[in-house]
């Protein structure tokens, strides 16, 4: 007899267990938690404890052994997933810091939103750190502020920007309060933190680019796919060879509709099942494919834009047409990942969007 192990978790804490068992020569099957949960709820009296969970996993393993996927942990896909997760965590922290900075700046500079186009831009951060409150601008001439802004912005900001800021500060009036030094320190601390996270994101993007290149894929040759998007696709899909065709990848990502019916009547319905993170990646990618340049009105990807309009002319709504784009993208991405081919943008007669 050859023992077979079934594990619910093969990507998190259970990954090391799966690797150890495989190295010892055992067969390890991945049991989706939804299957064991369905097994648990199939009994009249439900319970939840470790031993019963193990029994439910074993029951699923016995009944569905031929249909359960083998566990084959891939180090590079796992590492890419960890890098993507870390990057997302930094982005989330940066967003929280930016929101906190908005709150603090509102106390010090009521008109701060009119100072710079981006509150966390390079020049803006330099200004907030040097002048966290209007009291630091006392005695600063327009020429002095202009010189500071020119240096911080690499000669992008002019005298007009310095004049504009000083006029807004004057119009806002006195905003100095008790413990102003501590309040200023809070803003300066946030600025340093935001600057640090920006540097970390750049380093993370560089590391991701180097790592995904080891797979030999050319996903970034497709319009709309940069290093971040390519990394997200690889992290969520994993080893592409575990999907025998693009239809299975479409079902896994929740892009493919499911069959619903009763009493001999059946229809295809959009589903919210599948990997929703992967679904979001394909959705955002589909939106980019049908984008149109604001100035020239030329579509970013003429082929997909024409296909998008074709589906709408057939009676589909915009969301339905976008879903058709997503399904086609799944097929293309599947082929590019499996065969490690580049995307070839077909040339079409340039037509401006209406």
PLM segments and residue spans:
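A detector of single, family-specific signature residues
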Residues: 1-354
């Amino acid at each position: 007899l050859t023992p077979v192990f079934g594990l619910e978790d093969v990507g998190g804490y259970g990954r090391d267990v799966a690797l150890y068992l495989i190295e010892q020569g055992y067969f390890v099957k991945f049991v989706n938690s939804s299957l064991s949960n369905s097994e648990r709820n199939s009994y009249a009296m439900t319970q939840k404890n470790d031993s019963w969970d193990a029994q439910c996993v074993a029951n699923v393993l016995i009944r569905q052994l031929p249909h359960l996927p083998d566990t084959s942990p891939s180090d590079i896909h796992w590492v890419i997933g960890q890098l993507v997760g870390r990057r997302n965590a930094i982005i989330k922290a940066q967003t929280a810091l930016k929101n906190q900075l908005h709150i603090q700046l509102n106390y010090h500079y009521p008109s701060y939103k009119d100072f710079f186009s981006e509150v966390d831009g390079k020049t803006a951060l330099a200004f907030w750190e040097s002048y966290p409150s209007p009291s630091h601008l006392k005695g600063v001439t327009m020429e002095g502020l202009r010189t500071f802004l020119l240096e911080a912005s690499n000669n992008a900001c002019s005298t007009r920007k310095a004049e504009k800021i000083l006029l807004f500060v004057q119009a806002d009036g006195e905003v100095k309060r008790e413990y102003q030094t501590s309040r200023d320190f809070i803003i300066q601390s946030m600025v340093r933190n935001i600057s640090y996270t920006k540097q970390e994101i750049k380093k993370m993007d560089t590391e991701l680019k180097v790592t995904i290149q080891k797979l030999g894929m050319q996903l970034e040759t497709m319009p709309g796919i940069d290093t971040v998007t390519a990394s997200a696709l690889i992290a969520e899909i994993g080893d592409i060879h575990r999907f025998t065709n693009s239809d299975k990848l479409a079902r896994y990502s929740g892009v493919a509709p499911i069959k619903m019916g009763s009493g001999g009547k059946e229809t295809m319905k959009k589903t919210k099942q599948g990997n929703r993170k992967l679904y979001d990646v394909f959705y955002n990618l589909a939106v980019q494919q049908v984008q149109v340049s604001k100035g020239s009105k030329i579509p970013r990807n003429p082929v997909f834009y024409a296909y998008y309009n074709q589906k709408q002319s057939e009676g589909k709504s915009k969301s339905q047409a976008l879903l058709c784009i997503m399904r086609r993208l799944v097929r293309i991405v599947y082929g590019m990942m499996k065969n490690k081919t580049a995307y070839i943008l077909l040339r079409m007669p340039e037509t401006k969007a209406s």
